[in-house]
Amino acid sequence: MPMATAPQDEYRALELLSRTPYGRVAVSMRALPFVTVARHIVVDGRVVLRLHGGFGYAQACDGSVVAYGADNLADREEGDESVWTVQFVGMARRYVPGPADLEAFGRAPVAADSTPFVPEYLCIEPQFITMHHLEGVPARRPAHSA
């Protein structure tokens, strides 16, 4: 699998990440893999994640190598037939966001699985970044109309 190792590719991958607010973080927890949704921002070449603390995922990720991925599959505008994906791995560490970070994240969700959303933050320095583009991908249309 080709790795995006050229600095311009890494810059482009982080620029694409900054265009979409959510992705998925994956880590091993009790020897089993899990994946969960996370809100992300890109800050000085690092990716900062906001997760719901009630799930315990930030604690499980802290100090571990995680994989993170995001794409524009759900965020494409009408007529946009370009799909991109960005994935990377890196060490996740708990993070205390500053005022600028909190502003960039915007309002947190109100609830997660019917419980009050309690934000926890992780910071990852991306390594082994991969980026893929697909062209000519038509927008998905519902199979059935309501």
Regions flagged by a language model, labelled:
Residues 2, 67, 72-146:
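Charged, gly/pro-rich active-site loop segments
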Residues 20, 44, 63, 83, ...:
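Sequence-level motif detector for i,i+2 pairs with an aromatic at +2
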